[in-house]
Design a protein with these regions (language model features):
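N-terminal strand-loop element at the rim of the active site
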Residues: 5-13, 26-76
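Conserved donor-binding/catalytic core segment of Leloir-type glycosyltransferases
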Residues: 4-6, 180-197, 203-207
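Carbohydrate-associated surface elements
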Residues: 154, 171
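A conserved nucleotide-sugar
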Residues: 32-34, 199, 203-213
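A structural motif in glycosyltransferase catalytic domains
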Residues: 20-23, 27, 187, 202-205
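A conserved, positively charged/aromatic
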Residues: 93, 121-146
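A short, basic/aromatic alpha-helical/loop segment that forms part
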Residues: 13, 174, 194-199, 212
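Short His-centered aromatic/hydrophobic patch
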Residues: 82-85, 103-109
Length: 213
């Protein structure tokens, strides 16, 4: 199978980039699919997550939208960026001729309905839709996508118009390590202090863990 992953900026050091690299490597190494990762934005930074040598990484070199306080100019800049990204993406997709195209992040949601291909178009939601400031623009993607993949069942409920919605949690490739010494009663959690990270739930869960150890 010929698989394409579309991501905003593969040079970013984030969770989406990490999971895309893991999936791409797994599809290629374990299932022997042909895999291409397409990075939309122009970014000269070194990529943080290594792809197998057999996986193609294509940069479309689309410049970022201009940052300005002028709302009209900002909107026009974003529209131009989107149209340029759609043009270059369609040109690249035509050359690759994939069987399935996975779209990620906000830009991916906007590009999916603009991508003209016979391949299956699947949107991977890596963020709860309600937390995305541009979620109101997801309607067209929702109707055009052959499927939407979410991380949780609660996330899946937010895509009522989609033809098919699947829940596939992110996998972890870090070996399980058992704690041998429970004498240390201190624990740390690292992450952005935002509602979507669920630190409130983590604190609640830790109460039960503390009782056991």
């Amino acid at each position: 199978m010929n698989i394409v992953y579309v991501i905003e900026d593969y040079s970013e050091n984030g969770g989406v980039e990490k999971i895309v690299s893991m999936k791409a490597n797994t599809f290629y190494q374990e299932y022997h699919h042909q895999v291409t990762v397409i990075s939309i934005y122009e970014d000269k930074r070194k990529q943080q997550y290594i792809l197998n040598e057999g996986i193609r990484l294509i940069h479309l070199h689309v410049p970022f939208a201009k940052k300005t306080r002028n709302k009209v100019y900002k909107l026009l800049s974003r529209i131009i960026t989107l149209l340029l990204a759609a043009y270059r993406l369609n040109k690249t997709i035509k050359q690759i001729n994939p069987d399935v195209v996975f779209f990620t992040t906000t830009l991916g949601a906007l590009l999916l309905p603009l991508c003209h291909t016979k391949a299956k178009r699947i949107y991977e939601s890596h963020l709860a839709r309600s937390f995305n400031p541009f979620h109101a623009l997801f309607g067209l993607m929702e109707r055009k996508a052959d499927a939407v993949v979410c991380l949780t069942h609660d996330d899946a409920k937010e895509f009522q118009l989609a033809k098919n919605v699947y829940v596939i949690p992110n996998f972890i490739n870090i070996p399980h390590q058992k704690v041998k010494d429970y004498s240390c009663k201190k624990a740390i959690a690292v992450g952005r202090l935002e509602q979507q990270k669920g630190f409130d739930r983590l604190i609640t869960c830790w109460k039960d863990v503390a009782k056991l150890y």
